């Protein structure tokens, strides 16, 4: 991805959040210079990779396949004494923008619709070899209510509602085409994106960044560079 795409995506996300009166922690609005001035009391934020994330999953077409997220809370599997025993994200999707098919080996998550556009979620079971099973039915829970699904079924999630994704359940979600920008969220067990994503095809969570313009916002993957030029 280009840094210019990331800057614009976060600017757009902040506008969408402001429009729906969704507030984030103060450091969500910091500049790189603000981060340079941050003291050691902020080290838990950087260690646990809280803050902004933005990816096109290596597909090179962010407007179609991508997401902008802010990790509000998370724990640390290597340091169980700190952080929280759960994760929370706020995400923003443009109309028609989607994530690629993927599952998690360990994480259970509620995907929640909050404001704006309509959240759409598609589900498939996984085969024992971790490929997608395109024939078998299954079941999930929406706000605690059991729902059966056929392979590839799409659920439309109204505002205030959620769908629970369990391990090894292939899913992708998006903001319904022709609608508004979607503000959604995720509440989950501790999130470990570096090791707990299994994507279909050639998609990947972390992608190289082309620094075509200065950073306006730091991503959580930028934190190791805080003592370098940002």
Task: Locate the predicted segments by residue.
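Conserved metal-binding segment of the jelly-roll/cupin
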Residues: 94, 151-178, 184-189
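A short, N-terminal "cap"/entry segment at the start of jelly-roll beta-barrel domains
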Residues: 1-87, 216-222
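Glycine- and acidic-residue-biased ligand/ion/polar-headgroup-sensing regions
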Residues: 94-95, 107-109, 113-129, 134
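A short beta-loop-beta micro-motif enriched in histidine and acidic residues
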Residues: 78-87, 98-110, 114-115
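Short helix/loop capping segments that flank catalytic or ligand/cofactor-binding pockets
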Residues: 101, 122, 173-174, 195
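His/acidic/aromatic-lined binding-pocket segments of jelly-roll/cupin-type domains
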Residues: 89-91, 109-113, 120, 154-155, ...
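Double-stranded beta-helix
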Residues: 2, 128-148, 174-230
